[in-house]
Curated annotation (Swiss-Prot):
GO biological process, one term: sporulation resulting in formation of a cellular spore
Domain of life: Bacteria
Statement: the UniProt record of this protein carries the keyword Transferase: yes
PANTHER family, per the entry: ANTI-SIGMA-F FACTOR RSBW, ANTI-SIGMA-F FACTOR RSBW-RELATED
InterPro entries per UniProt: Anti-sigma-factor_SerPK, Anti-sigma_F, HATPase_C_sf
Name this protein carries in UniProt: Anti-sigma F factor
Disulfide bonds: none
Taxonomy of the source species: Bacteria, Bacillati, Bacillota, Bacilli, Bacillales
């Protein structure tokens, strides 16, 4: 069965936990393992934080958009902003790379996403924003909704 959810919120750091919990609650209907749920929550947190901190540089007027699609035992996540975009995507995907060392950012966001998800696609254009598409195949999915 296919099920979808869309969520849009202001680019405020306090909304990161709201996004993480909302996505986890929606995905729970597939009965993921605790590890799978934790990995998805972590990835949502990383992507949303990137949008807020890097995409909008802390500008609360920006919006973060999340789309979640559940299709049988597969979770598809899209996290998008219309912020600054990424000028060098290859460099940004390198472990420990950060544009904000003064904020003590670890530069591991994309690395974490790539390790926890089955597929990660990033589209970004300077001054146009960034879209991250993530796919996760759940191991013991027993969809609870009919």
């Amino acid at each position: 069965m296919r099920n979808e959810m869309n969520l849009t919120f202001s680019a405020l750091s306090q909304n990161e936990s709201f996004a993480r919990v909302t996505v986890a609650a929606f995905i729970a209907q597939l009965d993921p393992t605790l590890d799978e749920l934790t990995e998805i929550k972590t990835v949502v947190s990383e992507a949303v934080t990137n949008s807020i901190i890097h995409g909008y540089d802390g500008n609360p007027d920006g919006k973060v958009h999340i789309e979640v699609t559940l299709d049988d035992h597969v979770v598809y996540l899209t996290i998008r902003d219309e912020g600054m975009g990424i000028t060098d995507l290859e460099e940004a995907r390198q472990p420990l790379f950060t544009t904000k060392p003064d904020l003590e950012r670890s530069g591991m966001g994309f690395t974490i996403m790539e390790n926890f998800m089955d597929d990660v696609m990033i589209d970004s254009s300077p001054e146009m924003g960034t879209t991250i598409r993530l796919t996760k195949h759940l191991s013991k999915s027993k969809a609870l909704c009919n």
